[in-house]
Amino acid sequence: MLARKVLARQCLVVARLCAGRFASSLCGCSCRGLMRPPKFNSSKSLSRSMTSSSLFESPNCPSCGVVLQTEHPDKDGYCLLPKGERKVKNYQNELKEKLFLNVKREELADRLGHEVDSESLIIPKEMYQKPRTPKRLVCQRCFKSQNYSLIDHSIREENPEHKILDEIPSNANIVHVLSAVDFPLGLSKELVNRFKPTQITYVITKSDVFFPDKLGLQRTGAAYFEDSLVKLVGADPRKVVLVSGKRNWGLKQLLSTLPRGPNYFLGMTNTGKSTLIRSIVGKDYSKKQTENGPGVSHLPSFTRKPMKFKMDNNSLELVDLPGYTAPNGGVYKYLKEENYRDILNVKQLKPLTSLKAYTETLPSKPKLFNGVRVICIGGLVYIRPPKGVVLKQFSLVNLPSFMYSSLKKATSVIQAPPQALVNCSVVKEDSPDELVRYVIPPFYGLIDLVIQGVGFIKLLPTGARNTRELIEIFAPKDIQLMVRDSILKYVYKTHAEHDSTNNLLHKKNIKARGQTILRRLPKKPVFTKLFPVPANVPSHELLTMVTGKDDLAEEDKEYRYDIQYPNRYWDETICK
């Protein structure tokens, strides 16, 4: 009797360890009745063999949206079906035998006599084997890109802005995704002309570049982007949201802002649109992000067809549209393929407190220029300050920066790089053949030179100003550039030019006695296009071409601080 009770307890332990997947009735001993027999319907279990019909419940690639097919490897959407059934080791039976002190099933059956036979001690396969969840089946283009960073050259698809907008219904709700690092160059002008402001929600991604935590994001960063979008396109400030798809910042605020029904996510390629949707979908379903949402990649135009994602409550639907590309490919026309990933890695600014001035974020030493020397930023941009200018510059983009004795020397290194400078450039060797010459209109203080799809470079002239010449910029013709009054003046608290009693301070006393404030966007222009100029015009004549004056010395005396400078020669039409 005692031995039978021991066996009953052992059966109960085995049953509990197997998570209730088999009942005590299987063993037939006196433990019968101690556990409720589980309800099991073998017809509901998933088959281990995966058929093509079950895999193609959704005929589109869940990563890029293209229609899947298995017959033509050289055509678009080709995918490989997974191989056959996988063998599963019977760990539960092994555990049961160990708990019974290695007593074989036949011996155990003899001890229990007529109450049980050896076959009843074998656990049916369906009881311990979990149904296999099909893996995401993706096309070979996505698979190779995400796992091996390989580019399929046979698939080159450009998505102009108007082509993407044509897929959006006229009464739709639109989420316009913009990147903070090249803001506002990704702004769709045609979108604003086609749809009402009430239909558009603006989402600023990659905001974590400026802030170490999401608290600073909302406290000091939101006002700048709200003011800018109101000024440029008449946006509703209540429908401007700052997020970080990588860190899951601002997702709750975004979901509470979006109206019910379908919301079409629109943005330039590689603005973080698909990453944002993956974060939202993954958070909603409480699963890993890799199991939900669209695929992400450093390749341009990775999403190729509209993809719909319904949230759990079924009242909100996210539609991921393909990213629209810059005319003629933009920066990707000139980039080497092995450097596609580099331009997405933006340097993180060191966290600033309210007691630190934004100028402290310029670590480079000032350099004196002679009017001929140039700074080359990865071969994408060449900066030539005028003679006598002392310039501090800091590149927030992950690109190599080199100084050359002249523009001719810099381009010759790009076209035929020596072994020591083979990594000085991220562009193709023929990119200098399409250089266009620009000038920055007169400015005062810290500015950002913004490169579309890449990031920005901070420029700060120090010392006496050159009032007769302008800073010249050279870049390949299809790379879009602009200048903005430095974003750091507005997303961080800075020192004002007056103290707590509103007395105007001398420059040297601003840091010590200036009142700490968060600046709002002024009425003056804070964005401007670069002015293209002929390549053969002497540098000393460029100021006259832009301003109509040959010297700004008298005008310069009127303003003591950069915040007072009116930027009267700036042109904001690039953003309108």
Swiss-Prot record:
A single GO cellular-component term on record: mitochondrion
Primary location: mitochondrion
Keyword Cell membrane: no
Gene3D superfamilies: P-loop containing nucleotide triphosphate hydrolases
Keyword Membrane: no
Transit peptide feature, positions: 1-49
Keywords, sorted A to Z: Mitochondrion, Transit peptide
One Pfam short name: MMR_HSR1
Location(s), subcellular: Mitochondrion
Gene Ontology molecular function: GTP binding
Superkingdom assignment: Eukaryota
InterPro entries membership: G_CP_dom, GTP-bd, Mito_lipid_metab_GTPase, P-loop_NTPase
Limits of the CP-type G domain: 162-327
Family: Belongs to the TRAFAC class YlqF/YawG GTPase family. GEP3 subfamily.
Function: May be involved in the mitochondrial lipid metabolism.
UniProt-recorded name of the protein: Genetic interactor of prohibitins 3, mitochondrial
Species of provenance: Komagataella phaffii (strain GS115 / ATCC 20864) (Yeast)
Lineage of source species: Eukaryota, Fungi, Dikarya, Ascomycota, Saccharomycotina
